């Protein structure tokens, strides 16, 4: 029987990643099928899977680097969060990355008693309670305009349930899972588009998978898969919201190297260009996600803030027609002069004029 320590140590984090990746891999099509918010592009399950895959790969790289020795827990937890950050896909994946980053900020910090700590707050279960609370609060802060009935609501319910539970880490994780699952069933009544479609929130559904995996890593008993999907109905094509009516045409995602001040200005700029704005990260590295009509303007805003790279642009209309098939790609050219920009534009590329790097 595998070891099931009542502590989120390095081995448990590795197991958590593995179990979560397996669960999302099994459920990704089901989650894709109920994806109707914020855009019905049928990719939430896939985006969550790819985000967790990047996190898992980062964790495995740490274990490889340590060779036959067991890695430091802090190194593994930070790697998980960093891997999710650089590999985050879509709105849901970006929020998941911030949830993991919030947890890592607590779980990877030195465990020292501080003035004002409540009894047990620095033990393993207490740290997990604080980590789940930090995860939820940091995710809300990352979203420009938080909406209830989404994975944010589910994350908060998980943190609330964990905070109200005594016992070890496994018991706290189980309470968080139960709280998240209960909150998930309430999402159709909180968000009208979910109620009309008769589904729960897709991002929240994926988060329940991730929390179920956490339970499995700490207790050795992962909650039954059939219980996680209770109340979900597949959206028929003739009932799905029209992707092309209302809302921006493009999803733009990129990694950005920039300082805190520049990112604060970028948030304001992007908030005026579109919606579904989520900016996650810190310490000079960020993942930027936004839905806009002018993809070039969103990228140019990133160039003004710092150094954007790994730029991805998805046209929602194309995603609707080719759901769960190969995503169409766009070409973005960063060019030094207007003449070259004109040539690239005529060839069908989105062009951005290069600017000197910011010094503040």
Model-identified regions with their sequence ranges:
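N-terminal loops that bind phosphate or other acidic moieties
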Residues: 1-360
């Amino acid at each position: 029987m595998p070891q099931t320590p009542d502590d989120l140590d390095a081995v448990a984090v590795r197991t958590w990643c593995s179990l979560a990746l397996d669960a999302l891999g099994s459920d990704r099509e089901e989650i894709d099928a109920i994806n109707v918010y914020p855009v019905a592009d049928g990719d939430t399950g896939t985006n969550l899977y790819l985000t967790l895959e990047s996190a898992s790969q980062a964790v495995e790289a740490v274990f490889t680097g340590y060779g036959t020795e067991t890695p430091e827990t802090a190194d593994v937890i930070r790697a998980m969060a960093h891997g999710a950050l650089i590999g985050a896909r879509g709105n849901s994946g970006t929020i998941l990355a911030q949830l993991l980053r919030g947890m890592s900020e607590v779980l990877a910090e030195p465990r020292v008693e501080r003035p004002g700590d409540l009894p047990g707050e620095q033990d393993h279960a207490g740290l997990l309670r604080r980590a789940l609370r930090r995860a939820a609060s940091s995710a809300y802060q990352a979203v420009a305009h938080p909406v209830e009935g989404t994975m944010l609501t589910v994350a908060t319910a998980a943190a609330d349930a964990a905070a109200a539970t005594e016992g070890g880490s496994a018991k706290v994780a189980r309470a968080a899972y139960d709280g998240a699952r209960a909150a998930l069933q309430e999402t159709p009544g909180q968000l009208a588009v979910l109620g009309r479609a008769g589904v729960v929130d897709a991002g929240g559904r994926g988060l329940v998978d991730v929390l179920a995996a956490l339970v499995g890593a700490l207790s050795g008993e992962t909650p039954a898969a059939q219980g996680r999907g209770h109340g979900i109905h597949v959206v028929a094509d003739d009932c799905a919201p029209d992707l092309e009516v209302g809302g921006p045409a493009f999803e733009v995602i990129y990694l950005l190297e920039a300082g805190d001040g520049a990112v604060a200005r970028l948030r304001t700029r992007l908030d005026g260009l579109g919606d579904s704005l989520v900016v996650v990260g810190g310490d000079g590295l960020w993942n930027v996600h936004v839905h806009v009509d002018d993809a070039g303007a969103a990228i140019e805003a990133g160039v003004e803030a710092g150094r954007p790279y790994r730029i991805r642009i998805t046209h929602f209309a194309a995603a609707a027609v080719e759901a769960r098939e190969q995503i169409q790609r766009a070409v973005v050219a960063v060019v030094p002069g207007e003449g070259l920009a004109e040539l690239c534009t005529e060839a069908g590329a989105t062009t951005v004029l290069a600017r000197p790097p910011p010094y503040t």
